[in-house]
Amino acid sequence: MQSIIEIDLHGKNRYQAKVAIDAALRRARPDVMRLRIIHGCNNGTALRDMVREEYAGHPKVRRLESRLGNGVTDLVLREF
């Protein structure tokens, strides 16, 4: 069964958000196929932009998918 890990970034700054995402990528089990990053869109785009810029070329990330009116970005992971 494929799993999804959700990470809610509300209330976090860019540094805290990156630390949380990096930790989730490091500890993701082989059955985890997506990290669902909930960054919101009503209070600016800094977190959304950081997620999309930092992780678009990450070696563990196959592609990014936008969800829910740009308030959520899924990191679709590569199989390792």
Regions found by a protein language model. Name each.
Residues 1-80:
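Long, charged, low-complexity intrinsically disordered regions
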